[in-house]
């Protein structure tokens, strides 16, 4: 069965594993998912990310992060730009998620970056997701 929105599937797998407090999860690899996973790791939302090569497209293993009392680090994920309704922003319209507590992941001409980087570089793009 073909998947119409692999980014939404990636976010949903993270959300579901986070809700039941799994240590890790695996998703089929793609360049955009690798970039998103690296952003989540660099921003401190996940513990680690590992790439597994196989004969097909490869697998991304994401290790989730929890606080001292097993509280969730990721409290919410939301897909913004969907295949049926794309959402683009100009450089001066880049959104802030929860006044800077969360991040927006944006696909730009310079690759997949966070909202902070997009504001610093003064570039816009397609808003893929909000994570807080």
Swiss-Prot record:
It comes from the Bacteria. Keywords: Ribonucleoprotein, Ribosomal protein, RNA-binding, rRNA-binding. GO terms for cellular component: ribonucleoprotein complex; ribosome. One of its GO terms (biological process) is translation. Transmembrane segments: none annotated. The keyword Ribosomal protein applies. It holds the Pfam family Ribosomal_S8. InterPro entries: Ribosomal_uS8, Ribosomal_uS8_CS, Ribosomal_uS8_sf. One of its GO terms (molecular function) is rRNA binding. HAMAP family: Ribosomal_uS8_B (MF_01302_B). Part of the 30S ribosomal subunit. Contacts proteins S5 and S12. Belongs to the universal ribosomal protein uS8 family. One of the primary rRNA binding proteins, it binds directly to 16S rRNA central domain where it helps coordinate assembly of the platform of the 30S subunit. This is Small ribosomal subunit protein uS8. The gene is rpsH.
